[in-house]
């Protein structure tokens, strides 16, 4: 549950009173919250508000969803090939479940130095900033791939502006491939673009990521 996540001291060290106190510092937010929750900012109202918000994030009925339900014409042949390649490369190991991600923390530099060529920042520490464990350095939550075409830029440091760039980084730093097959990248992009769903029966709107 949301309450369990916030109580997890390794990721969220603050208790409810501290969280509520911080939120109350925003007087405009506190006033709006009291319109819905007269009791004000508490652990219960925070979790309820977040839960209600998260309901709006459900975006089903993507072309890929329709394909999985048996509509062979819902996605292109290239997208189908991209999906097979996605499975062959093992991408579903981390990008798993209905959300295709968001369930685990993985190392950004599994097969290479993701941070080479630039100065490191505190954000590059990843999960270690919360857990304080050296073993969690450079570990980041795997993002969901739902609506991925609309959620650019990519990576924790926004270093990839396009899907092609993001895939290229994964090829190098997660799979350890030196040479990139551009045809494979195009197939994967075709597949990823089928993951844009609907909200209230209409296609999710947003700024599409730039073309490579």
What are the functions of these language-model segments?
Residues 1-212:
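Periplasmic c-type cytochrome electron-transfer domains
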């Amino acid at each position: 549950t949301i309450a369990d996540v916030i109580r997890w001291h390794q990721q969220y060290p603050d208790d409810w009173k501290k969280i509520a106190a911080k939120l109350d510092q925003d007087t405009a937010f506190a006033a709006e919250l009291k319109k819905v929750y007269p009791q004000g900012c508490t652990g219960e109202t925070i979790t309820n508000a977040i839960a209600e918000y998260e309901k709006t994030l459900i975006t089903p009925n993507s072309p890929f969803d329709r394909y999985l339900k048996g509509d062979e014409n819902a996605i292109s042949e290239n997208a189908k090939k991209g999906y097979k390649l996605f499975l062959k490369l093992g991408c579903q190991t981390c990008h798993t479940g209905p959300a295709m991600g968001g369930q685990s923390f993985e190392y950004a530099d599994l097969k290479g130095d993701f941070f080479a060529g630039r100065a490191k920042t505190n954000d590059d520490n990843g999960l270690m900033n919360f857990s304080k464990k050296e073993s969690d350095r450079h570990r980041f939550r795997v993002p969901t791939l739902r609506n991925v075409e609309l959620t650019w830029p990519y990576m924790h440091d926004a270093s990839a502006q396009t899907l092609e760039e993001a895939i290229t980084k994964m090829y190098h730093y997660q799979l350890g491939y030196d040479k990139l097959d551009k045809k494979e990248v195009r197939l994967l992009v075709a597949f990823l673009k089928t993951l844009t769903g609907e909200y209230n029966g209409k296609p999710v709107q947003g700024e599409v990521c730039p073309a490579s």
